[in-house]
């Protein structure tokens, strides 16, 4: 049998689950323990098919709208956050609901409301249609929050009063792209108020920093994550921008395009914030089957963040 070719595998850290995702999954599991199945979940709890399928097997029912849920079963709101109208509708129907919105997203919601109460018009930097953007914009009446996605959008945006503006951002954006958009906003509207640093969360920032470290070392980068995961897609972009000629998103090992990887001597691997470590290990094992793998851990930060689950699930 021919000897396997050698391969250096740079494993980025931090990678995978963040504290908000961990908490959201725990909320669904604890709700199923407390109330039994079915427990309804509005929108995928986190953007990962493997996680969602696992929870579905345990009795979670995933729906897109509250109207699809019966009044007499608990409903959980996803980690991405929801517009204010959603809990209001649940209360009107006297439903039991648990909000699994990531606390770092909730912080952005509070910020947006605080600025609006101070009479400032809100601008949101985010991706149109992403559930987090929809949720944050939905903290204020329709039309009150202006969305910008690119530097080009900043030139087009029409505001009521350039002296009375504030901005917030989606938590899962590219750190570098967002800096450029913020700079464009500040150049056009010098009086604009924003957070001390962008609202991009610690986990998004850390995962992008780790990719910047591994991307130039490797012939290729694989990001384990789902196609609808904003933070995972940003990791692919960051890899491509930082010197990695082949950067690809894979949901799991079976999605690896081996032909595209022919002749590589090194690979970098990371995972989006909603991808379980199990899927990363599956990808590493697939490389071990084909190569003589030497794993090098590249760690750029250590994360110790933990979020408590809501009180309703902590009590018997």
UniProtKB/Swiss-Prot annotation:
Keywords: 4Fe-4S, Iron, Iron-sulfur, Isoprene biosynthesis, Metal-binding, Oxidoreductase. GO terms for molecular function: 4 iron, 4 sulfur cluster binding; 4-hydroxy-3-methylbut-2-enyl diphosphate reductase activity; metal ion binding. [4Fe-4S] cluster binds at residues 18, 102, 201. It is an enzyme of class 1 (oxidoreductase). InterPro entries: LytB/IspH. The keyword tRNA processing does not apply. (2E)-4-hydroxy-3-methylbut-2-enyl diphosphate binds at residues 47, 80, 130, 171, 229-231, 274. Its cofactor is [4Fe-4S] cluster. Dimethylallyl diphosphate binds at residues 47, 80, 130, 229-231, 274. Binds 1 [4Fe-4S] cluster per subunit. The keyword RNA-binding does not apply. The active site is at 132 (proton donor). Pfam families: LYTB (PF02401). Isopentenyl diphosphate binds at residues 47, 80, 130, 229-231, 274. GO terms for biological process: dimethylallyl diphosphate biosynthetic process; isopentenyl diphosphate biosynthetic process, methylerythritol 4-phosphate pathway; terpenoid biosynthetic process. PANTHER family: 4-HYDROXY-3-METHYLBUT-2-ENYL DIPHOSPHATE REDUCTASE. Catalyzes the conversion of 1-hydroxy-2-methyl-2-(E)-butenyl 4-diphosphate (HMBPP) into a mixture of isopentenyl diphosphate (IPP) and dimethylallyl diphosphate (DMAPP). Acts in the terminal step of the DOXP/MEP pathway for isoprenoid precursor biosynthesis. This is 4-hydroxy-3-methylbut-2-enyl diphosphate reductase. It comes from Ruegeria sp. (strain TM1040).
């Amino acid at each position: 049998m021919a000897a396997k070719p050698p391969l250096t595998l740079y494993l980025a850290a931090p990678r995978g689950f963040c504290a908000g995702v961990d908490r959201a999954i725990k909320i669904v599991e604890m709700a199923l323990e407390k109330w039994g199945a079915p427990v309804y979940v509005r929108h995928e709890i986190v953007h990962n098919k493997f996680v969602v399928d696992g929870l579905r097997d345990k009795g979670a029912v995933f729906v897109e709208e509250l109207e699809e849920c019966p009044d007499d079963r608990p409903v959980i709101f996803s980690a991405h956050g929801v517009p204010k109208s959603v809990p209001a509708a649940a209360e009107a129907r006297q439903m039991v609901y648990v909000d699994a919105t990531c606390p770092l997203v909730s912080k952005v919601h509070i910020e947006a409301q605080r600025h609006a109460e101070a009479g400032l018009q809100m601008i949101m930097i985010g991706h149109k249609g992403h559930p987090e953007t929809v949720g944050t914009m939905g903290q204020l009446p329709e039309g009150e929050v202006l969305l910008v996605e690119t530097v080009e959008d900043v030139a087009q945006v029409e505001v009521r009063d350039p002296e009375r503006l504030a901005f917030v951002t989606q938590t899962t954006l590219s750190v570098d792209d967002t800096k450029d958009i913020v700079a464009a906003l500040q150049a056009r509207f010098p009086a604009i108020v924003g957070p001390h640093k962008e609202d991009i969360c610690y986990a998004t920032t850390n995962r992008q920093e780790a990719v910047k470290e591994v991307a130039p070392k490797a012939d290729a980068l694989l990001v384990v994550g789902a196609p609808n995961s904003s933070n995972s897609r940003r990791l692919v972009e960051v890899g491509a921008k930082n010197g990695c000629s082949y950067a690809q998103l894979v949901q799991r090992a079976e999605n690896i395009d081996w032909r595209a990887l022919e002749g590589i001597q090194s690979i970098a691997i990371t995972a989006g914030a909603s991808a379980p470590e199990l899927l990363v290990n599956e990808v590493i094992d697939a490389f071990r089957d084909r190569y003589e793998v030497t794993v090098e851990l590249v760690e750029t930060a250590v994360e110790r963040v933990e979020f408590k689950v809501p009180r309703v699930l902590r009590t018997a």
